[in-house]
């Protein structure tokens, strides 16, 4: 079976979907699994042994489009090569118009996603052929696993795995950073893709102070 995972970004969203990738591969070891992702965050998935084909796209031309015909025109040239994989099924973990559009353009006859109430853009439901209803209150990782399980018919795994690929270059870079550290250290990540997701600098300062007081 040829399976397409549609999860374009962001970094956190990709990490939340990795357990579903692991579960699909464990349940279907002979499946051909592709993942379509935004170019800007594709490094998270490059070299991942569980992925047969990593398809990197730039969906800027789709942003802000209000009509599906406009979105299809804007992104069509980039995604025509999707059809050569002859996907049997596409699973839209994103729940947006642009992700559902990519699933549609892939040529997959079965296009699975969350039920309308679980979609971030509910009107994108029209591009899906099948949906899975999951409880709203469960963790997003388990929501994604429930979608994958419902779409492909496997039993939910007991163990949640995060198959993050690392290259030798990543290891060298991390070792160099650790070598410069003196004693124990903590890692704080103040960055974010959206202003609404950024924590105040003062709060990072308070956190750093408390870490130092407790563990310094």
Where are the predicted features?
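Catalytic machinery of carbohydrate-active enzymes
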Residues: 1-216
């Amino acid at each position: 079976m040829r399976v397409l995972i549609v999860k374009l970004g962001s970094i956190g969203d990709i990490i939340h979907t990795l357990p579903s990738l692991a579960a699909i591969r464990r349940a279907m070891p002979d499946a051909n699994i592709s993942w379509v992702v935004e170019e800007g965050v594709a490094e998270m998935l490059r070299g991942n042994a569980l992925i047969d084909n990593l398809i990197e796209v730039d969906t800027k031309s789709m942003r802000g489009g209000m009509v599906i015909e406009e979105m299809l025109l804007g992104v069509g040239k980039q995604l025509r090569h999707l059809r050569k994989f002859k996907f049997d099924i596409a699973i839209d973990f994103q729940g947006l118009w642009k992700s559902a559009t990519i699933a549609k353009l892939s040529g997959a006859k079965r296009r699975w996603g969350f039920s309308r109430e679980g979609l971030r853009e509910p009107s994108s439901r029209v591009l899906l052929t099948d949906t899975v209803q999951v409880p709203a209150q469960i963790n997003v990782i388990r929501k994604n696993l429930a979608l994958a399980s419902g779409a492909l018919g496997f039993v939910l795994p007991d163990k949640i795995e995060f198959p993050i690929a690392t290259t030798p270059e990543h290891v060298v870079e991390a070792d160099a950073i650790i070598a410069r550290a003196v004693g124990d250290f903590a890692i704080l990540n103040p960055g974010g893709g959206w202003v609404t997701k950024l924590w105040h600098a003062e709060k990072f300062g308070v956190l750093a102070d408390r870490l130092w007081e407790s563990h310094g």
